[in-house]
UniProtKB/Swiss-Prot annotation:
GO terms for molecular function: toxic substance binding; toxin sequestering activity. Probable antitoxin component of a type II toxin-antitoxin (TA) system. The cognate toxin is VapC5. Keywords: Toxin-antitoxin system. The keyword Glycoprotein does not apply. Forms a complex with VapC5. The C-terminal domain (residues 55-86) does not neutralize non-cognate antitoxin VapC4; exchanging the N-terminus (residues 1-54) with VapB4 however allows neutralization of VapC4, while exchanging the C-terminal domain (residues 55-86) does not. NCBIfam families: phd_fam. Belongs to the phD/YefM antitoxin family. It comes from Mycobacterium tuberculosis (strain ATCC 25618 / H37Rv). GO terms for biological process: positive regulation of growth. This is Putative antitoxin VapB5.
Length: 86
């Protein structure tokens, strides 16, 4: 892991970020003391679901738990009280 002074980070941000993007961990220092570590973002591996597990989760999920109640309340409403649309 290399060290970069905050001054160098300020003056050459793009260069330091290129090094990080290339896989290098960079410690940022202020007055010679470490204050932060820049590390490259490592993509998370996706965990694939089997078709059976996916369908099981899909069937068990409800997008909006209150939707049924909201629809029941609105079922009797009309727009007659709004008057004619011109």
């Amino acid at each position: 892991m290399s060290e970069v002074a905050s001054r160098e980070l300020r003056n050459d941000t793009a260069g330091v970020l290129r090094r990080v993007r290339a896989g290098e961990d960079v410690t940022i220092t202020v007055s010679g003391r470490p204050v932060a570590v820049l590390t490259p973002v490592r993509p998370r591996r996706r965990r694939w679901l089997s078709k059976t597990e996916f369908l099981s989760r899909l069937r068990g999920a409800q997008a909006d738990p209150g939707l049924r109640n909201d629809l029941a309340v609105l079922a009797g409403d009309t727009t007659e009280d709004l008057g004619p649309i011109r």
